[in-house]
């Protein structure tokens, strides 16, 4: 997908408290799939580390959540959406660290 010049990319990385727990992983993935229903999201991807091995690559996270929005305003709307707030309430106990990278075009 080509990102519009005003587009906004929101990339979230989750480190699970119990990375060996298939149940916790599944619960987070189910939560993200529900979260994808927020109307301002253009597209999304739920990913895992690719297993590449170079010094510059961090493979220590458990799940990534890549979101595309039409604008920064749409991303702000997403942040306050009840679906997003419910996700945080129901799933935040699963992770011990979250790191987010937000990008826009030059």
Region spans (language model):
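Short S/T/G/P-rich N-terminal loop/turn motif that feeds into the first structured element of a domain
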Residues: 1-62, 70-77, 104-106
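An amphipathic, aromatic/His-enriched active-site/gating alpha helix that lines ligand/cofactor pockets
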Residues: 38-40, 68-101
